[in-house]
Each structure stands twice: as structure tokens, then as C-alpha cells.
């Protein structure tokens, strides 16, 4: 009898409790394993001093000595090796002739777009920090990386955070300290966001990390010629704000040079590989925004991962806060979702990268920022 009463009470109480429905709707049906990459590594074997060009005629590498090279290029690129008739290059970083590998190619910028609302999914306009990225890797005559230059073309800020930082990191397993010194082309004050030792126009990697973190900026806003507005180059109703391009030179320790074949870019950490990551910092040092599978630094605020129920800088339905195009493309206007501005972005993501890397065509110009031009392909 008591058992029947308890069962009856349980039924009555249960009928009074309303379990909230999960109202979350995934905007895109993205395969869980999709890495959001438009780039890949292609292995090239050089047997004599050579240049490398892609199918468009863009220069990927110049004056490479014999060796194996893992070149980061747009997916499905066709690469050609052309014998060089020039003399071997000088070894000084900044010299006019260099043995160099370029990303995405010589004299051209890829486009990096960050969303600042991590760990929330955000408004998906991907314009909170936008910049052109070009990296030059300098090698010695044994095909080892000895230095690299990170070229930045600031383009837009759609973030309300007054302080935004950019940084790179270089790491491998087991941990190794690679960097000898860093120098900046401008008088940027980097240690308002990053803890560095600075002297004589050079500065150190950020102190207190398990691997080398290379500050690229102090406040990213300092490179925009407009100190009064928060939103810069993200609304067509606003006047164009010009920006200052700059670069950061990174020289490696003589005993830490590594074979170019070991280099990866924006890839997960892996034994035997040396990866270079690019990430953003929004508001405070702990709020880092990385590409999917990026490695957080010691200053990252790890409770953010509790909010996302993931630890790889992607949501449970595999949305991300960092996107890269290998081309110089226009970014969405404020509050315009990237997959509305670029209709093929949706099919590209939902197919797990199918159809190649050209999701930026066609474009809906009404949804894109068009009040200025940073040598866009569209």
C-alpha cells in the first residue's frame, strides 16, 4: 500500500515539473571533425637552388637550397619548382635578397578574422579584429629555419573592447625555447598587454609561459588613425579609417634552428613538428581567441572551456571564433553574418571543406564593408 502511494505521488509531482526544452539551434550543420582550414601542407623536395611558384604564378619560395620543405599553401594548389639562376642569398634578416618561403605568397596577404564574444558563439560577423597576414620564413643553406617576419596589415575593428592584442606562438613537444630576440618595425609599446623585457628596440618573448609567445602588438587599435571611435571600418555609413602596416622580426637561437620540413602553421601541436600559431587577446590577457585546436598560453582563463564544454576553441557544434582566407578578401559589415555575406561559406563549412577554399565567391556586397580597399580580390 505504501509503495502504491509513493508511486502515485511520484507521478503527480513529475507531472507538475516542466523540464525546459533546449532552444539552442545550430545555424550551420558543420561536421564535428572539420578543421576550418583553407590551407594545407605540401611537401616539396629541392635538389638544386630553386624557386617555387603556384599555379597562379605567385612566388611561394625563393632561392631555396637543397632539402625537403613542407610548404603551407591553399588546398589543392599546384606547385612548380624552377631552377634559380641567382647567387645564394645573404643571411641577414631584412636583406634585399633572401632564401625565403612566403605565406600565402610573396607580397600578398591572407585575411584573418576574429570574433570577440568567445566563449559565446557571437553574432558571426567575424569582424571584431581583421587584418592581412603575410609571413616570410628565412632559411639557411641547410634548409633550416633561422628567422621569420610577420607582416600585418590592420583593416578593421568591430569589437567594443578598448584593448585588443595580437600574438604568435611557436612550440613543439617536448618544449623548446626557440626565440633569441624580437624587433618591431614601429615604436609599439607591447608590454601594456604582454609581459616582456624590452631594451634597445628589441624585446623578449612573453615571460611566464611554457613555450615561446611572441607579442605582435601592444594595443591593435594603435595602428588605426582614429582614436575616438570604437568601431573602425565595419560600417559603410562611417568614413574610412586609414591604418599603419607593420612587421615583427623574430630571430631564432643558433642552437634552436629546425628543419623547414618540421614547420607547421595553425596546426595542432604534434611530436616532431614545430607549429606557429596566431591568436588574439580581447579586453584582458586571459581572453585568448585561437584558431580551432590552437594551444592556449599560461595566461589563458581556463574556466572559459567549462562554458563551451570543449577545450579546442570550437563550440559543441563546431563553430569557431577565428577564420582565415588565403586571399585578401572583404570582411562582413557589423551584424552581417559571414555565411550571408558569402553564401558559399555555408556549403563549404557544412560539407567539411568541400568545393575547395574559394568560399569568398560569390559575395553579397550589401553585406560586406566596401568603404575602403586593402588590395581585395573581391
Give short role names for the model-derived ranges:
Residues 13-34:
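Bacterial Sec-dependent N-terminal signal peptides
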Residues 40-42, 146-150, 246:
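Structural beta-strand segments of beta-rich domains
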Residues 39-64, 126, 162-164:
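Short, ordered, surface-exposed loop/turn motifs in non-cytosolic proteins
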Residues 133, 145-156:
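Short, well-ordered beta-strand segments enriched in hydrophobic/aromatic residues
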Residues 208-378:
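A eukaryote-biased signal for long
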Residues 1-8:
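Sec-dependent signal peptide recognition
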Amino acid at each position: 500500500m505504501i509503495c502504491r502511494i509513493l508511486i502515485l505521488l511520484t507521478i503527480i509531482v513529475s507531472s507538475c515539473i516542466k523540464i525546459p526544452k533546449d532552444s539552442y539551434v545550430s545555424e550551420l550543420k558543420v561536421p564535428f571533425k572539420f578543421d576550418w582550414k583553407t590551407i594545407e601542407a605540401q611537401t616539396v623536395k629541392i635538389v638544386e637552388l630553386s624557386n617555387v611558384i603556384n599555379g597562379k604564378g605567385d612566388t611561394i619560395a625563393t632561392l631555396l637550397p637543397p632539402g625537403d620543405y613542407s610548404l603551407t599553401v591553399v588546398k589543392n594548389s599546384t606547385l612548380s619548382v624552377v631552377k634559380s639562376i641567382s647567387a645564394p642569398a645573404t643571411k641577414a634578416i631584412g636583406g634585399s635578397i633572401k632564401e625565403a618561403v612566403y605565406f600565402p605568397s610573396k607580397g600578398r596577404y591572407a585575411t584573418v578574422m576574429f570574433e570577440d564574444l568567445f566563449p559565446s558563439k557571437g553574432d558571426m560577423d567575424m569582424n571584431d579584429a581583421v587584418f592581412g597576414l603575410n609571413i616570410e620564413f628565412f632559411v639557411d643553406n641547410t634548409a633550416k629555419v633561422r628567422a621569420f617576419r610577420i607582416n600585418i596589415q590592420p583593416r578593421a575593428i568591430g569589437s567594443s573592447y578598448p584593448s585588443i592584442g595580437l600574438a604568435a606562438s611557436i612550440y613543439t613537444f617536448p618544449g623548446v625555447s626557440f626565440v633569441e630576440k624580437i624587433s618591431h618595425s614601429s615604436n609599439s609599446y607591447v608590454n601594456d598587454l604582454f609581459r616582456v623585457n624590452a631594451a634597445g628596440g628589441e624585446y623578449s618573448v612573453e615571460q611566464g609561459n611554457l613555450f615561446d609567445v611572441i607579442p605582435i602588438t601592444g594595443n591593435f587599435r594603435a595602428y588605426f588613425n582614429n582614436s575616438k571611435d570604437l568601431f573602425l571600418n565595419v560600417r559603410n555609413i562611417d568614413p574610412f579609417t586609414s591604418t599603419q602596416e607593420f612587421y615583427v622580426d623574430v630571430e631564432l637561437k643558433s642552437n634552436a634552428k629546425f628543419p623547414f620540413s618540421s614547420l607547421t602553421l595553425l596546426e595542432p601541436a604534434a611530436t616532431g613538428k614545430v607549429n606557429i600559431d596566431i591568436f588574439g587577446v580581447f579586453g584582458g590577457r586571459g581572453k585568448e581567441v585561437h584558431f580551432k585546436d590552437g594551444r592556449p598560453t599560461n595566461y589563458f582563463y581556463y574556466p572559459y572551456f567549462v562554458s563551451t564544454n570543449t577545450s579546442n576553441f570550437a563550440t559543441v557544434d563546431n563553430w569557431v571564433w577565428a577564420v582565415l582566407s588565403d586571399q585578401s578578401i572583404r570582411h562582413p559589415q557589423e551584424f552581417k553574418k559571414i555565411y550571408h555575406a558569402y553564401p558559399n561559406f555555408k556549403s563549404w563549412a557544412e560539407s567539411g571543406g568541400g568545393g575547395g577554399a574559394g568560399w569568398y565567391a560569390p559575395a553579397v556586397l550589401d553585406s560586406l564593408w566596401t568603404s575602403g580597399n586593402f588590395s581585395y580580390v573581391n
